[in-house]
Amino acid sequence: MDPFFLNTQHVELLVSGKQSSPQDLLGIVSESLNQDRIVLFRPGAETVFVELRGKIQQAESHHSGIFSLPVMKGISPQDYRVYHQNGLLAHDPYAFPLLWGEIDSFLFHEGTHQRIYERMGAIPCEIDGVPGVRFIVWAPHAQRVSVIGDFNGWHGLVNPLHKVSDQGVWELFVPGLTAGACYKWEMVTESGQVLIKSDPYGKFFGPPPRSVSVVIDDSYEWTDSEWLEERIKKTEGPMNIYEVHVGSWRWQEGQPLNYRELADQLALYCKQMHYTHVELLPVTEHPLNESWGYQTTGYYAPTSRYGSFEDLQYFIDTMHQHGIGVILDWVPGHFPIDSFAMSGFDGTPLYEYTRNPSPLHPHWHTYTFDYAKPEVCNFLLGSVLFWIDKMHVDGIRVDAVSSMLYLDYGRYAGEWVPNRYGGRENLDAIRFLQQFNTVIHEKYPGVLTFAEESTTFPKITVSVEEGGLGFDYKWNMGWMHDTLHYFEKDFPYRPYHQSDLTFPQWYAFSERFLLPFSHDEVVHGKRSLIGKMPGDAWRQFAQLRLLLGYQICQPGKKLLFMGGEFGQGREWSPGRELDWELLDISYHQGVHLCSQELNALYVQSPQLWQADHLPSSFRWVDFSDVRNGVVAYLRFADADAKKALLCVHHFGVGYFPHYLLPILPLESCDLLMNTDDTRFGGSGKGFREPEILTPEIARQEREAAGLIEADDESGPDCWGLDIELPPSATLIFSVTLQ
């Protein structure tokens, strides 16, 4: 009678590649009270040799690639190694214990495993003193899962994983593997189809178009402990973000700078320009350059386009050493249809949302995630926790939140299925975003979350406890749209669009807002910021300086996409560096210097950031001069402050040697910033000493200017401020109220 390990059914499953529990058959098995047996499977091998406690022995050959060697009772995995056909001598993968435990299983299938990135994927480790790599993957509908790579000739039958739970988690420890090993998953689906897949939990990948996963050794020695300890104190400080696409900021010898080359250059530039943070367009791995990183296939992996895993850690560490925070763009709303990645992962739509008639997102032709599955939510949650824990990022900007919140986003009637209450809200996505924010803020206080959300969905930045989503900041897309819409209008038409400037103040404090001029506004025919401005070159540059000043003065945190700070002329393209040579031209030099000084003033002025989410931080002075396009307001650090900043914006092209503003009683008024300074390329007007006028004198001036009739007694008289108002400029004054 054949020994049990030659059971026909077991062997057939193993040979046919459908064995889901190879650990039960292979490795060290008990044969009798006094004897164990080492059972090996080597498809295609004629002989197999085993080194047992220093002695080389030939294993018995059975059939169909099964080999065995009788050994004394109590042999351990460390006691023997197996010779492979390529000459490799390694320990037996199937002799080592499985480590995925009940707690792992419970947390993962509940969607709450907060260190899943240390369990799933390829994890270098040591078991019983033997180094190697532990492979774990979730594929509940696969008949068989194997890890394939250079180490086994990419042969799917050599290293099948063991199914450790009835919910589809597979595991195998491969001794002797080290960092740098390349691998993929080979799966047999329920229908018998063989699939080759990249690892969703892979920490690094070969350069595109290769999709091979790479084992990494996370041994970087960080030097930013002081930054991390102080990070929570910075959350209420100024926030002036420089949005950067790594591959097109600056090139060298016709190629983008790598992470290490970029680190010092970008850090010094940000310090010089007084930016507090950089926000990186997605550096998660992605197959298509033209997606800018927003179609992610490696949610746990930095893209290899610009260097190694450790190189990106060095970049972030360097930014922290220079006092610059790092925010990561992250895309949990959809993923690409590329067959090598997550789509149809185990032969079924494992990660995909399938309840709509078409599974593809109509805007991007991508799949949306199924947030009803705890394992999918845990995959996404684990990704963001990985970037915070292992890569030390300081903030997460969630892309396309609106597409997550609404089931009908981009879809017409009949193309979507309502929620259980008959509504359009994606209740599972809402629950996930609440979990996302709750976990981050509890586990990593000081790490900030940002929502790119373009609708009026309520309570984006309200705490989860109060029924909100729990984000720290929401991108103010309405402000950005209205502001740029106004600036694109030629000067004669602007009086008819003054509401573009005033309307955003009606909702400016309904959320904690960030004011962006982002990459999306300088591509696809929208023109660069300077290209949006009407008029001749002088007026265009004056308007850009005015725009940058307007953004700095408005309530909300700041974000500017690279190139806007010096008047990049062409639209942005990911396939070339910014046009840095423009800084040899005086107009561009002027904008650059103006941006630098505006940023410095912002960082140094608590009136512009300390309470910018509160209505008490903003008070209108005047927005009635629609014809000339003048608005003015005060900014306060707190409601009771006597010190304030007076911000005056002139969106027209006229020059007013004497312009009278109604104002609260003032003790002093001093000019801090004038974007019409000749140093910035301006006309040099606006520097006359402002005159504070009592109500009586102010009334006389208004009568003389024809603004009111001499016998007009309507309304109370107010103080006045007589300033020199240059064309197309922002003026910022420091004022002391009586």
Swiss-Prot record:
- Tell me yes or no: is Transferase among this UniProt entry's keywords: yes
Cited Pfam families: Alpha-amylase (PF00128), Alpha-amylase_C (PF02806), CBM_48 (PF02922)
HAMAP family associated with the record: GlgB
Give the record's family classification: Belongs to the glycosyl hydrolase 13 family. GlgB subfamily.
Q: In which pathway does it act?
A: Glycan biosynthesis; glycogen biosynthesis
What EC number(s) does the entry state? 2.4.1.18
Q: Does the keyword Transferase apply?
A: yes
Question: What EC class is this?
Answer: transferase
User: What is the name listed in the Swiss-Prot or TrEMBL entry for this protein?
Assistant: 1,4-alpha-glucan branching enzyme GlgB
Q: Which keywords does this Swiss-Prot/TrEMBL entry list? A: Carbohydrate metabolism, Glycogen biosynthesis, Glycogen metabolism, Glycosyltransferase, Transferase
Q: Which CDD domains match?
A: AmyAc_Glg_BE, E_set_GBE_prok_N
Listed under catalytic activity are: Transfers a segment of a (1->4)-alpha-D-glucan chain to a primary hydroxy group in a similar glucan chain
Q: Assembly state and interactors?
A: Monomer.
> Which Cys pairs are S-S linked?
none
Instruction: Explain the purpose of this protein.
Output: Catalyzes the formation of the alpha-1,6-glucosidic linkages in glycogen by scission of a 1,4-alpha-linked oligosaccharide from growing alpha-1,4-glucan chains and the subsequent attachment of the oligosaccharide to the alpha-1,6 position.
